[in-house]
Amino acid sequence: MAEQLACLVSDMEPGTARLAELTDASGANVAVAVIRSDDGDFYAIGDECTHGEVSLAEGDVKGCLVECWAHGSRFDVRTGEPDEFPAITPVKTYPVRIDGERVLVDVDAPKTIQKENA
């Protein structure tokens, strides 16, 4: 599959998150947290906190971070990297494209994190 409709721009105010149930090319369901940052940009990440089985779409959005409501782990929605313990594993991030009013997400093309060698 390619890009899929996750929501409409008008469905989300800045600083909010919502769950989108999408389907990958194999037919598997993929739960995605669509995030609209405080500055109005859209991001898509795997919905499940990597510390526990908790929906990140139910978390608080502050800037480009979403905080898991259960244990306080925070993730940078641009990279998926955890910003606060107890989570240490990043969440998947997915490409987002805005087409007019439509927020499109491609769950078959997760972004990869480029880390610099220390």
Predicted feature residues:
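Short cysteine/histidine-rich metal-coordination sites, predominantly Zn2+-binding motifs
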Residues: 63-69, 82-91
